[in-house]
Amino acid sequence: MSRESVILVHGLWMNGVELSVLGQHLRRDHGFAVRTFSYPTLHGNAAEICGELAKFGASVADAGRVHFVGHSLGGVLVHRTLSECGREFNGNAVVLGTPLNGSKAASGAARWPMLRPLLGPHVRNELAVAK
């Protein structure tokens, strides 16, 4: 069995269940130990969540090499976490459907007071920075 792990990080409005098929595939067909990092997408702040993701990754890294797979907002959080403390991890990162340069849709929606609560602070602060 591989001493390599994959941490799956879900996107906005998700909880990690949507990545379970990918996790099963990585476990069954490639021998990875798969863990899911779940976080609140509509409250809290990205800096705290990235800190928690770094701690989670460090706890998994004790067992060997760690890779990250982030979907959408999860990819933004993976990117930020690895940018700030990536030297601690010796694996790879894959982001799926991740708006690393911001999102014009999120930026537009953030301008509407009725839609702001649906976006949460992570989207308003991380994704709505459309470039």
For the regions a language model picked out, list residue spans one by one.
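Proline/glycine-enriched tight loop/beta-turn segments at coil->beta junctions
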Residues: 1-5
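Serine-dependent carboxylesterase/thioesterase catalytic core
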Residues: 6-12, 16-17, 26-27, 32-131
